[in-house]
């Protein structure tokens, strides 16, 4: 079996492409099940965030599995593969393993060291498990990646004071406007990103903040988390609130734009200054809004200027994090390499155990019933101990071989010397 990841991220694709390939949380399970109907796709998991869509697969045929995954993504979203392929990346074997662990550790994020990605990796594992998309290998891989992410956050300082998408968005608005204490700010959405937006806005001096959300109850719950007064409005008041604001942030899970040129043209004054910062993928603000005079629109791809300033300061901290990730990669790879040896080791142990039982039965029959009953446990433990000690070193050495060809050569020798057929043995065990 082989591990691969096919995907795109803020490094390979602009937001216009990322939003087209975005997969909503409610659609992940069904999407994985569809992918697993393809030949050669044994396991699958999907990590979908505002800055990346990554499909992790375990495949019996590497080339076919990767090709099928690429074609599946193109057909899923109705994007011709030749148009999509330049934005996709593919990583195989250990490179795929290392990539997921770096992602979970925040080392591949737009904002270096940001913490939200770890919870998103955990969610990807939960969704993959819920639809039976993940089995032994991907479960182990995601568990190892989550461990790597946790270690990086607890054993290094890369997460201390790290920016988030939300804090970078507020910083960008502050640089554009000079001050956040004047005028009204509207935050559209009431999820985690919206909560962080409000938190950072208050920290940067904003005093007149309104939260608008489809669920008024969720918006009220968000507002109650802060001591400062936060106004809450129902969804029907969205356009009025935007028209009264000089700064608007959007952070919702909507799959279509919630603000467009026609809507805003109907409520804004001619040349009314308005700064819109959209941190959602798919985008909440239609690109045609930029045609309005006086209106500035920023999306997640515009945060790079802010992020790079923060990244340069944090690059030294990343070195220690990379070392921890490498340790977790080595541990996973050692386990993964050992999987190939399991059928050979199991068939060898089964054969030797059968011989032990047969020979012990012969010996006990010659020793007589009374002796056998009296000393059965001792003789059984003795022979079992001898067998285990004889097999111990060969098994350890076989599992420990890092070179693939050397390990396979050793397995072939064992199979030939002991007349083993691991494939037949495994089939018998599965009956």
From Swiss-Prot:
Q: What is its EC number?
A: 1.2.1.70
State where NADP(+) binds. Answer: 189-194
InterPro entries the record matches: 4pyrrol_synth_GluRdtase, 4pyrrol_synth_GluRdtase_dimer, 4pyrrol_synth_GluRdtase_N, GluRdtase_CS, GluRdtase_dimer_dom_sf, GluRdtase_N_sf, NAD(P)-bd_dom_sf, Shikm_DH/Glu-tRNA_Rdtase
Biological processes per GO annotation = chlorophyll biosynthetic process; protoporphyrinogen IX biosynthetic process
Which SUPFAM superfamilies does the entry link to? Glutamyl tRNA-reductase catalytic, N-terminal domain, Glutamyl tRNA-reductase dimerization domain, NAD(P)-binding Rossmann-fold domains
- Molecular function in Gene Ontology: glutamyl-tRNA reductase activity; NADP binding
UniProt keywords (A-Z) are:
Chlorophyll biosynthesis, NADP, Oxidoreductase, Porphyrin biosynthesis
UniProt xrefs under NCBIfam families = hemA, PRK00045.1-3
Q: Per its UniProt record, what HAMAP family does this chain match?
A: Glu_tRNA_reductase (MF_00087)
Family indicated by similarity: Belongs to the glutamyl-tRNA reductase family.
* Role: Catalyzes the NADPH-dependent reduction of glutamyl-tRNA(Glu) to glutamate 1-semialdehyde (GSA).
Additional observations: During catalysis, the active site Cys acts as a nucleophile attacking the alpha-carbonyl group of tRNA-bound glutamate with the formation of a thioester intermediate between enzyme and glutamate, and the concomitant release of tRNA(Glu). The thioester intermediate is finally reduced by direct hydride transfer from NADPH, to form the product GSA.
Q: What is this protein called?
A: Glutamyl-tRNA reductase
Organism for this UniProt entry = Synechococcus sp. (strain JA-2-3B'a(2-13))
Gene behind the chain: hemA
């Amino acid at each position: 079996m082989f591990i691969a990841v096919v995907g795109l991220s803020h490094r390979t694709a602009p937001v216009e492409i990322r939003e087209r390939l975005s997969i909503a949380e409610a659609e992940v399970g069904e999407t994985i099940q569809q992918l697993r109907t393809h030949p050669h796709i044994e396991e699958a998991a999907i990590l979908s965030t505002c800055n990346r869509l990554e499909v992790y697969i375990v495949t019996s045929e590497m080339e076919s599995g990767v090709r099928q995954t690429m074609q599946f993504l193109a057909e899923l979203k109705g994007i011709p593969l030749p148009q999509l392929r330049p934005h996709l990346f593919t990583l195989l074997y250990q490179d795929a393993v290392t990539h997921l662990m770096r992602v979970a550790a925040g080392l591949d994020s737009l904002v270096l060291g940001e913490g939200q990605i770890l919870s998103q990796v955990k969610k990807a594992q939960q969704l993959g498990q819920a639809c039976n998309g993940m089995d032994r290998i991907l479960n182990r891989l995601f568990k190892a990646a989550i461990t790597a992410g946790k270690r990086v956050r607890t054993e290094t300082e890369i997460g201390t004071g790290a920016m988030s998408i939300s804090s970078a968005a507020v910083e960008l608005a502050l640089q554009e406007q000079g001050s956040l204490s004047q005028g009204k700010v509207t935050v559209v959405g009431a999820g985690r990103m919206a909560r962080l937006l409000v938190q950072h806005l208050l920290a940067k001096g904003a005093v007149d903040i309104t939260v608008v959300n489809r669920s008024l109850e969720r918006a009220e719950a968000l507002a109650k988390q802060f001591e400062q007064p936060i106004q809450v409005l129902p969804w029907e008041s969205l356009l009025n609130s935007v028209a009264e604001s000089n700064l608007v942030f959007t952070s919702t899970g909507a799959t279509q734009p919630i603000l467009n040129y026609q809507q805003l043209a109907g409520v804004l004054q001619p040349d009314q200054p308005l700064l819109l910062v959209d941190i959602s993928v798919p985008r909440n603000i239609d690109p045609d809004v930029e045609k309005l005079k006086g209106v500035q629109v920023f999306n997640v791809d515009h945060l790079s200027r802010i992020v790079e300033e923060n990244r340069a300061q944090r690059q030294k901290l990343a070195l220690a994090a990379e070392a921890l990730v490498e340790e977790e990669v080595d541990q996973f790879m050692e386990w993964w390499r050992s999987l190939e040896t399991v059928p050979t080791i199991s068939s060898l142990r089964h054969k030797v155990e059968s011989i032990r039982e047969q020979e012990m039965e012969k010996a006990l029959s010659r020793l007589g019933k009374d002796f056998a009953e009296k000393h059965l446990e001792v003789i059984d433990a003795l022979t079992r101990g001898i067998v285990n000690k004889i097999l111990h070193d060969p098994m350890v050495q076989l599992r420990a071989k890092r070179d693939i060809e050397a390990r396979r050569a050793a397995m072939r020798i064992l199979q030939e010397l002991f007349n083993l057929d691991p494939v037949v043995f495994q089939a018998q065990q599965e009956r």
